[in-house]
Curated annotation (Swiss-Prot):
Main location: cytoplasm
Protein name: Urocanate hydratase
Organism in which the protein naturally occurs: Vibrio vulnificus (strain YJ016)
InterPro entries assigned to the protein according to its UniProt record, in alphabetical order: Urocanase, Urocanase-like, Urocanase_C, Urocanase_central_sf, Urocanase_CS, Urocanase_N, Urocanase_Rossmann-like, Urocanase_sf
Entry's family note: Belongs to the urocanase family.
Active site feature: 413
Length: 565
């Protein structure tokens, strides 16, 4: 570390990490080269929010606990054999054990706490002592692909909002939101893709500038009047990054009787200490206060969140389609006395759950070669294999035209149980026959149909009341391990913060081998099938129909399913 960084082992401004490209391996096989490259890709300065501090996205979502741990993980992956498995505990490599060639090469557990102690206060104490790391969802599981990772899900949500509230017509309408970080930064592009204009309030000017450079936001404004004028005067959908405090701007719109068509938020409200700037505070003052009085920061942040949520509720009563986009801001406001904070819905029960019932979710893949042509070829293969889905084809065309790759070229594409395995097998065959220059890794967000328990987000309002049952993501992780995913992760607190979620992830490497084909057959079937199982078990008819069509064996439901075939 450089001298100026003092004692913080997580900060090193001298380091610049980029994933290797091409076909020369640093590790002993592609099965260990894959996690090595994707770990490094998470910390590429074109990908990560604060790479020098190992922060990938989502407040303090890290890829490794500290730089010594990062270096040791790299060292181990370079020497790991194909019958060994590396264990990673909250970003720290803690053991290498003998397994077998079809076992995962890496097993990861991040941020998990015994429920009674599963809160930010206890986590932050452990974090300060170097005993824990916040892994968010795809930060600590090494499958973050930049803002593209959530663009399609956000796009699908905005399209669904247009259908539900505006008869499918987005023209001339605009969205108000907050936050342009790693997740929130996807919102402006998703909105304009769906035909809406957007004003996105962000307190960190560097984030607005970054989204401008990468094409995720169109314009920058420093006053609300300027932002409103840009939206009003544009004949086509336009996105504006507005420098300001979300609570201030949302409240000002209420006071001025200006009502957006859609209102949402993607600030890092899940982490009141590190993720939300209190009203009246500068970025520098907030950083100083985090060192001096953490409780004061948390209190001030949550008070400001309450102001913002009250404004969102007021805009809802005036006709705005208002939705929570999964950052737990409603819960924070509720704890500050806003008793009706949950009067506006979360985006999953309102718009996404029917997709989850069919195992449809954020399937993603990355080209380990580093060559964009590998992604373009896989885009075409998806179109060939799913020829009768013009909506999906339109997404792929828009993605190629409008989304800049960050780090290793990658693609996000929402597909479900009936398609994931087929696509994985096709990609593996393309590697085998040389159509692609190097292997592909396939993963997903932890925000998926069967891999998360999050009562204020993905599992909000389950029809059987099982919102908080977290057996499901644990079973998902166990099954993906048994099936032979290349690496598997089990996390706590992603998206909505400590105490509010448990979730699992998997990544599988398509290296062109027959062994990979067998693993793909298991993993890319079983993984989405757990989502169909979970929703069928909760009573959703769409999930039961999908389970019957796909021949799932669900012992307590098989008699009912047999009548649906």
């Amino acid at each position: 570390m450089t001298q100026s960084q003092g004692q913080d082992p997580r900060l090193d401004t001298s380091r610049t990490i980029r994933a290797p490209h091409g076909t020369t391996l640093r590790a002993k096989s592609w099965l260990t080269e894959a996690p090595l490259r994707m770990l490094m890709n998470n910390l590429d300065p074109d990908v990560a929010e604060h790479p020098h501090a190992l922060v990938v996205y989502g407040g303090i979502g890290r890829a490794a606990r500290n730089w010594a741990c990062f270096d040791k993980i790299v060292e181990v992956l370079e020497r790991l054999e194909d019958d060994q498995t590396l264990l990673v505990q909250s970003g720290k490599p803690v053991g290498v054990f003998p397994t077998h060639k079809n076992a995962p090469r890496v097993l990861i557990a991040n941020s998990n706490l015994v429920p009674h102690w599963a809160n930010w206060e206890h986590f932050n104490e452990l974090d300060k002592q170097g005993l824990m790391m916040y892994g968010q969802m795809t930060a600590g599981s090494w499958i973050y692909i930049g803002s593209q990772g959530i663009v399609q899900g956000t796009y699908e949500t905005f399209v669904a909002v247009a259908k539900k509230h505006f008869a499918g017509e987005a023209k001339g309408r605009w969205v108000l939101t907050g936050g342009l970080g790693g997740m929130g930064g996807a919102q402006p592009l998703a909105a304009t893709m769906a035909g809406f204009s957007m004003i996105a309030v962000e307190c960190d000017e560097s984030r607005i500038d970054y989204r401008l450079r990468t094409g995720y936001v169109d314009k920058k404004a420093t006053t609300l009047d300027e932002a409103l004028a840009i939206v009003k005067e544009s004949d086509t959908p336009v996105s504006v990054g507005l420098l300001g405090n979300a609570a201030d701007v949302f409240a000002e719109l209420v006071e001025r009787n200006i009502t957006p068509d859609i209102v949402t938020d993607q600030t890092s409200a899940h982490d009141p200490l590190n993720g939300y700037l209190p009203q009246g505070w500068s970025m520098a003052y907030a950083a100083e206060m985090r060192q001096q009085d953490e409780s004061a920061v948390v209190k001030a942040a949550k008070q400001s969140m309450a102001v913002q949520v009250k404004a969102m509720l007021a805009l809802q009563t005036r006709g705005a389609a208002t939705l929570d986009y999964g950052n737990n801001i409603r819960q924070m406001a509720l704890e500050e006395g806003v008793e009706n904070a949950f009067d506006f819905p979360g985006f999953v029960p309102a718009y996404i759950r029917p997709l989850f019932c069919e195992g449809i979710g954020p399937f993603r893949w990355a080209a380990l070669s580093g060559d964009p042509e590998d992604i373009y070829k896989t885009d075409q293969k998806v179109k060939e294999l799913i020829p009768d889905n013009p909506h999906l084809h339109n997404w792929l065309d828009m993605a190629r035209e409008r989304i800049q790759f960050q780090g290793l070229p990658a693609r996000i594409c929402w597909v479900g149980l009936k398609d994931r395995e087929r696509l994985g097998q096709a990609f593996n065959e393309m590697v085998k026959n040389g159509e692609l220059k190097a292997p592909i890794v396939i993963g997903r967000d932890h925000l998926d149909s069967g891999s998360v328990a999050s009562p204020n987000r993905e599992t909000e309002g389950m029809m059987d009341g099982s919102d908080a049952v977290s057996d499901w993501p644990l079973l998902n992780a166990l099954l993906n391990t048994a099936g032979g995913a290349t690496w598997v992760s089990l996390h706590h607190g992603g998206g909505v913060g400590m105490g509010f979620s448990q979730h699992s992830g998997m990544v599988i490497c398509c290296d062109g081998t027959e062994d990979a084909s067998a693993r793909i057959a298991r993993v890319l079937h079983n993984d989405p099938a757990t989502g169909v199982m979970r929703h069928a078990d909760a009573g959703y008819d769409i999930a039961k129909q999908c389970a019957a069509q796909q021949g799932l064996d669900l012992p307590m439901l098989n008699e009912e399913l047999s009548k649906l075939k």
